[in-house]
Structure formats: structure tokens, C-alpha cells
């Protein structure tokens, strides 16, 4: 990505902006699910009409390049959603170019990290085949699916298939039947027999066989998965969780009514799952004041290694904190009294999470709307627009050494956010600034006037933008020409349903 952008030439005088070529459009699609410069949070159905650049690149013989982009986005975690990657891979796997198809099928195990991804990929292929006379289960797909299963060891596969059983109308049994899989190892053979024939057949086949320690461990694990489905004994469920690492997806609904079962799950619960369930765990009295479980939760939340491993962003923590602080769920069905120790741990965790962020080493100018309307809630969130803007200012101030933070007042004025400030302190500084109109062209005009070098301009507003004499796209183009910097502009309308400022054909605007 860097190489291509560094080769790009600045637009000539009078041009509308940086051309949004097919590679850039493809990257937009892989990241956001749409090719243009407007990204909307609401999900929409993916189809050929939203992936025209992808189709053009395949037609031009650049299909293998597309597959490499898909792999890069998947492996580096650059996509906002996984579905566009899986859709694009499905399209590549069904095109007429043999090399592209081969590359796409070979990439399936790399892009489909968990069974859910594999099921979604298969469903996209089925959708793309609608109206076509030929079947989709040719030799190449059968091999790709077989390689997905055979590429794992027995224990890893057992964990995956018992946790993610089915999705998008597909199950593991379906895929094994249609792929004609030949197990590459004894472990895979055991798991596939378990899926297709059931535990009793596995038990019968191995009851008198001498097996390795690894196979013994696998058989014990599958036995535990089966046992937990049949038992009503709370102590046995807890033992199976602790002994074999069973997770919530392995348990029956009735098991999850038990406080003690939740306490057992809590010990090895990933931090991302914990953040989503704090309210429920408190409401069900699993987390009680000064209890040992509260201590476990607080220790996890303050653990920087766990935050980094779980790729937890400060926003994840803040949303969990604000949701937990309110004391009830979105629909009001679940109520709880927030635990003070957990609130303190969440607050500490919020600031620790900034340390896990990687700097981009770009030069940023962040411009913030400080009007009263920024107190509105962001669409689908518990956070206000001003809080989101403040956190993003903190992210930039703490991770990017070369950054400027400004606010829309009577003119662009400095917003004094420093790396050591807390969120309340940042919000106070924002509230102290006299309100001005939110003209999205002003950051570029200000930067050009003050000779401020910037690679990225980001504007945070709610829904209100004032159209001044110079459109933002023109101001950005003029800045690029005068400063000789291929700068980009991102305008984030946080309470808007239909917000379009970015030039539709400028790959440097979003």
C-alpha cells in the first residue's frame, strides 16, 4: 500500500483530487464493504454492484494481485468486517482465470481463520452460483475445504468444531460430506468421525486400541464435550470446565443459570468476552462486592499483556465502562448495581489500553467540533459524540509524536490536549473553547496558512457542517499542491445517517 501511494503523482492544477484507481477502490471494499469514499456503519448486502473494481481487476488479469490484497487485509487485521474479504475471495474462486482461482482456493485456510469464516465463504459461493447450471463443489473447492481441516492438528480442530458448530445454514457435517475429506492424521480422523458418526462410534473404534498421549488427550476432550451435554450435576459441569477448558458454547442453557458455573468460566474467559458480560455477571451475583471473582476480573482488566493479546482498543474499554456504569442493558431487561472496584479497574484499563496502540508515524491534524450538539449519542453507542472525539484526540496525542489538535471556533484554534491528560480533562478543555461553525475546509486552509505539514486531516463532528466559500475537496487539493504533500482527509459524522463530504473519486478522502 505504501509503495503504491509513494509512486502516485500529485494532481495537476484544477483537478478534482487524487484519482481513486481500482487498487484503491478494492482496498476500500475490503476494508469497508464499499468502493467509494463514504463508509456507513449499517451493514448492507454485498453483491457485484458494490465490487466493480474487483471484477475489473480480475478481467484485466490482476486476479492474483486481488488475492494477495485479501490475504494481507486478513492477516494484518485491516478490515472493519470480515464479510467483504470472504465475498471477494469467493468471487476470485469462481472467476474464469485459472491462476486466480488457484490462488483463491490456496488462500482459504489463511483467510478463513475460524469455522464461521469458512461457512460464510461457502455461503457466498452458493449465492454467487444462483442461476448457474454448473455445481459449485468441484475438485478445487473440495481440496480447499479438505486442506482447511487437514491443516490443523487434532486438538486444535476439536476445539474449533465443538465451539463453532454451524453458521449461514452450513455445518461441519455438510462440509465433510461434500468435500470427501481424507484425514491426514489420526487426530483429524478422530474429529471427522466424531462429526459424521458421533461420539459412540469414536468410543467403539478406540476402546481397545493402544493410542499415543496426544490421541488420549483428544479423546478425553471429546468425551468431556459429550458428558457436559448430558449432565445436570453442577459440580460435574464445573469440573469439566476446569479440567478440559470447556467454554460457554459447549454448555446447555440450563448450565448458564448457575452462578458457580459462570465463576468457573470466568477464570479463563478472554478479556473481550468479559467486557461484554460484566453487567450480566454482576446482575446474576457472580460478581459480588469484595468477592474473589471481582478480584479476578480486576486483575484481568489491569493486565497490559492481556489487553495487547486481545487487541483491546481504549474504545472497547470505554464502551464497557459507560455501559456498566449505567447499571442496565439497552433494552432495560437486565439491571445491576455497578461494583466500585470494577469501575476503578475499567478506568485504569482504559488508560493502559493506549499503551498497546501502534503509532502510524504520520503527521496528523485533528479538528474537533465543540458545539453543544456534540453531546448527542453516537449512532448505536452509549458514548456521546464529544466523548468519542475526545478519545480520538487522546489516541493521537499519546501515539503520534507529530500531531496538532485544533477546534472550530471563530477560527481554527489550538485544542491543548497532551499525552498525560485524562478523559475528563480533555473534555473540560474542549468545553472551554468558544463555539464556531464547522466548516470542514478550515483545517486545510489553516494548515496551509500556518505552513503545518500534515499527512492526515481528521474532522470529528456530529451532523452539522457549515458550507463555506471553499469546498473541503478543493481546500484539500490546494493544500496538496502548495505543500507538496499527498495529504488525506477523513470526515467523521458521528450522529449522521446520510453524510457525504468526501469526493467520491478521491482515494485520499473518506
Residue ranges and their predicted role:
Residues 1-383, 401-510:
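Long lumenal/extracellular ectodomains of secretory and single-pass membrane proteins
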Residues 387-404:
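Metal-dependent nuclease catalytic cores in nucleic-acid-processing enzymes
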Amino acid at each position: 500500500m505504501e509503495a503504491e501511494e509513494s509512486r502516485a503523482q500529485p494532481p495537476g492544477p484544477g483537478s478534482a483530487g487524487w484519482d481513486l484507481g481500482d487498487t484503491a477502490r478494492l482496498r476500500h471494499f475490503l476494508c469497508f464493504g464499499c468502493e467509494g469514499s463514504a463508509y456507513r456503519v449499517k451493514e448492507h448486502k454485498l453483491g457485484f454492484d458494490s465490487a466493480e473494481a474487483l471484477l475489473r481487476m480480475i478481467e484485466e488479469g490482476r486476479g492474483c494481485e486481488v488475492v494477495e490484497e485479501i490475504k494481507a487485509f486478513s492477516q494484518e487485521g485491516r478490515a472493519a468486517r470480515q464479510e467483504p474479504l470472504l465475498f471477494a475471495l469467493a468471487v476470485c474462486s469462481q472467476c474464469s482465470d485459472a491462476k486466480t482461482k488457484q490462488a483463491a482456493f490456496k488462500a482459504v485456510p489463511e483467510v478463513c481463520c475460524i469455522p464461521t469464516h469458512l461457512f460464510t465463504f461457502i455461503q457466498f459461493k452458493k449465492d454467487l452460483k444462483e442461476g448457474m447450471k454448473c455445481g459449485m463443489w468441484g475438485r478445487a473447492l473440495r481440496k480447499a475445504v479438505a486442506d482447511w481441516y487437514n491443516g490443523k492438528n487434532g486438538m486444535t480442530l476439536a476445539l474449533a468444531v465443538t465451539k463453532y458448530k454451524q453458521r449461514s445454514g452450513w455445518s461441519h457435517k455438510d462440509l465433510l460430506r461434500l468435500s470427501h475429506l481424507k484425514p491426514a492424521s489420526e487426530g483429524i480422523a478422530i474429529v471427522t468421525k466424531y462429526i459424521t458418526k458421533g461420539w459412540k462410534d469414536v468410543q467403539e473404534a478406540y476402546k481397545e486400541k493402544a493410542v499415543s498421549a496426544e490421541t488420549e488427550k483428544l479423546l478425553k476432550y471429546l468425551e468431556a464435550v459429550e458428558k457436559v451435554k448430558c449432565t445436570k450435576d453442577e459440580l460435574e459441569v464445573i469440573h469439566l470446565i476446569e479440567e478440559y477448558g470447556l467454554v460457554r458454547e459447549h454448555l446447555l442453557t440450563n448450565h448458564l443459570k448457575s452462578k458457580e458455573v459462570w465463576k468457573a468460566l470466568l477464570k479463563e474467559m478472554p478479556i473481550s468476552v468479559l467486557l461484554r458480560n460484566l453487567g450480566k455477571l454482576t446482575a446474576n451475583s457472580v460478581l459480588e462486592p469484595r468477592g474473589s471473582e471481582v478480584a479476578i476480573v480486576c486483575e484481568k482488566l489491569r493486565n497490559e499483556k492481556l489487553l495487547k493479546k486481545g487487541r483491546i482498543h481504549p474504545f472497547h474499554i470505554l464502551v464497557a465502562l459507560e455501559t456498566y456504569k449505567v447499571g442496565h442493558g439497552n433494552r432495560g431487561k437486565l439491571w445491576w448495581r455497578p461494583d466500585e472496584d470494577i469501575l476503578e479497574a475499567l478506568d485504569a484499563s482504559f488508560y493502559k489500553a493506549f499503551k498497546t496502540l501502534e503509532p502510524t508515524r504520520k503527521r496528523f491534524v485533528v479538528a474537533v467540533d465543540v458545539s453543544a450538539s456534540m453531546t448527542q449519542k453516537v449512532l448505536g453507542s452509549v458514548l456521546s459524540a464529544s466523548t468519542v472525539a475526545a478519545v480520538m484526540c487522546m489516541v493521537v496525542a499519546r501515539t503520534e509524536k507529530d500531531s496538532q489538535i485544533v477546534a472550530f471556533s471563530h477560527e481554527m484554534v489550538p485544542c491543548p490536549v497532551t499525552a498525560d491528560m485524562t478523559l475528563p480533562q480533555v473534555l473540560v478543555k474542549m468545553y472551554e473553547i468558544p463555539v464556531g461553525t464547522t466548516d470542514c475546509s478550515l483545517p486545510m486552509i489553516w494548515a496551509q496558512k500556518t505552513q503545518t505539514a500534515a499527512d492526515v486531516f481528521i474532522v470529528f463532528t456530529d451532523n452539522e457542517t457549515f458550507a463555506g466559500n471553499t469546498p473541503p475537496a478543493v481546500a484539500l487539493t490546494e493544500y496538496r499542491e502548495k505543500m507538496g504533500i499527498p495529504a488525506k482527509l477523513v470526515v467523521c459524522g458521528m450522529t449522521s445517517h446520510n453524510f457525504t463530504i468526501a469526493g467520491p473519486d478521491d482515494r485520499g478522502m473518506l
